[in-house]
Amino acid sequence: MDFKRLTAFFAIALVIMIGWEKMFPTPKPVPAPQQAAQQQAVTASAEAALAPATPITVTTDTVQAVIDEKSGDLRRLTLLKYKATGDENKPFILFGDGKEYTYVAQSELLDAQGNNILKGIGFSAPKKQYSLEGDKVEVRLSAPETRGLKIDKVYTFTKGSYLVNVRFDIANGSGQTANLSADYRIVRDHSEPEGQGYFTHSYVGPVVYTPEGNFQKVSFSDLDDDAKSGKSEAEYIRKTPTGWLGMIEHHFMSTWILQPKGRQSVCAAGECNIDIKRRNDKLYSTSVSVPLAAIQNGAKAEASINLYAGPQTTSVIANIADNLQLAKDYGKVHWFASPLFWLLNQLHNIIGNWGWAIIVLTIIVKAVLYPLTNASYRSMAKMRAAAPKLQAIKEKYGDDRMAQQQAMMQLYTDEKINPLGGCLPMLLQIPVFIGLYWALFASVELRQAPWLGWITDLSRADPYYILPIIMAATMFAQTYLNPPPTDPMQAKMMKIMPLVFSVMFFFFPAGLVLYWVVNNLLTIAQQWHINRSIEKQRAQGEVVS
C-alpha cells in the first residue's frame, strides 16, 4: 500500500469523522397520523411568555438556579463545577434568558381543554434566597386560589446532584371533580453554544426517547423546514407510556424524565403526549403533557417529575433513566464509540489521569490491531525495498504504460509483493479511528481534564500547538519509512499532507491529537522494525514472505 493510498485512507477517515452527521443527517421523524386530535389539544395550551422575571436564587454545591417568582419558570441554571467555555474564570451557564440566548424550563397545569389554568395568576414565595441545608433544599411557590383549586409549585434540589424535582401540590375545593394534566417543557432558541467550530461541531437541539420510537434527534432545521412549508407551527407529536425528552448540546443536556430507573412512570394515569415544535415566537420547545388522575372535590393530589439539567456524565445519566446515556452524542457510531469510552473510563479509574489513559488506550488498540496492521506494513516495507527496481522499470519503458504495467506485475510476482495486500487491514481500522474520535470528542469527562504541563484541558485545542507540530513531525517520519513514490505529484503530496493535517489538527481537542501522536509514534516504531527486518533478510539473500 503506497503513500497515496495511505493518505487517502486518513483523508476519508477524517472526512467521515467530521462530516458524517452532515452527509447523512438523522431522518426526520414522522408524527403518527392517528394522533391529530391529540395534536390540537396539546398545541391549544398557551405558550408562556418570557416576560421580565422576579428572581428567586437557589444555591447548592453543584448549581445556582434562578426561578421566576411570578411564572415559576426555571430561568437560569449555572453549573458551579464547570468552567465557561469562553472564559475559564466564570462558571458554565446552561439555562439563561438574557440577550445572548434563551434556554429555560417551564411547567404548567392544563384543564381538559388544554388551557393553562395558571395563566396570569402568578406565584409568590416566602423569600428570595435559598441555599443548601443538609442534603436538600425546597422552594415552594404558592398561587392564589383559582377555579377553586389551591396550587403550589415546589422545586427540590439535592446535594451533589443535577436532578431537580418539580412538583405541583393541588388541593381541590372547587365543588366538582378536577380533570387536569401537567405540562412540562424546555424552551430554547437556535443560538450555537460557545466552542462550536467546523472541526469541533456537535449536535444542538431536541432529543426524545420512547420505547416505540427509540432514540431520535429532531433537528432545528427539520422544524424550520416544516414551518417554512406553510404550517403555523411545525410539530412532532407522540403518545408514550414512558421515556424522556429534552435538549442536548456538546457535553451538556436538559431532559424531563418520565420514568426514573426502578420507579413508576409519571404516565401511570394515562399515556403522556410528547410535543416538539418551533413555536410562533420562533423559539423551539420540547414538552410533555402528563394526564393526572381525576381529583375529587375535597381531595389533594400531586404531579411530580424529575428534570436532569447538567453534564452528560455516562456513569451518572445511565443510572437516572433507561437509555438516557444515548443522549451523549456519539454521532452514528454510538455502537462502537460507547464501548471504547467504557474501556477508556476503566483505564482512567486505574491510572487517575485522562491523558495517560488515552495513551494506554492507544497502545491497547494498536496491540489488538497488530495482526492486521502488520500485514499492511510488511507490504509497504517490501514495496519500499523494491522501489529502485520500480524506478528502473519506469525509466526503461518511459511512456509505454502497457509494457510498464506488465513489468511491474512481473516484479510483484518475483518479489512476492501484493500491491493491494495492505489495503483491507487499513480500511478495517476506519471504524476504530471514527469510534475513538467520537468517544474522545463527545465525553464531558475529558472537559477541563489536564494531562501534563501546558495541556490543562484535553477537550480543548492545544494552546501552544505543540502536539499538532509533533504530529506533523511524526507524519514526516512516516513518509520517510514508506515506499518512495515514483510519481512527482505523489512526491509533492508526501511533503504537503503532513502540513495540511497538522494545521487541521490545530483546532482539534488536545485529547484527540494526543491519541493521533501516540498512534503515529507506535506506527513509526512498527514500520521501522519491519523495514529493518526485511532489509536484513534481503541482505542475507533470504526470500521475504
UniProtKB/Swiss-Prot annotation:
It comes from the Bacteria. It holds the Pfam family 60KD_IMP. Coiled coil: none annotated. The keyword Ligase does not apply. The keyword Plastid does not apply. Its main location: membrane. Keywords: Cell inner membrane, Cell membrane, Chaperone, Membrane, Protein transport, Transmembrane, Transmembrane helix, Transport. One of its GO terms (molecular function) is membrane insertase activity. It is found in: Cell inner membrane. One of its GO terms (biological process) is protein insertion into membrane. One of its GO terms (cellular component) is plasma membrane. Gene3D superfamilies: 2.70.98.90. It is a multi-pass membrane protein. The chain crosses the membrane at residues 350-370, 424-444, 461-481, 498-518. Belongs to the OXA1/ALB3/YidC family. Type 1 subfamily. NCBIfam families: PRK01318.1-3, yidC_nterm, yidC_oxa1_cterm. Required for the insertion and/or proper folding and/or complex formation of integral membrane proteins into the membrane. Involved in integration of membrane proteins that insert both dependently and independently of the Sec translocase complex, as well as at least some lipoproteins. Aids folding of multispanning membrane proteins. Interacts with the Sec translocase complex via SecD. Specifically interacts with transmembrane segments of nascent integral membrane proteins during membrane integration. This is Membrane protein insertase YidC. It comes from Neisseria meningitidis serogroup B (strain ATCC BAA-335 / MC58). The gene is yidC.
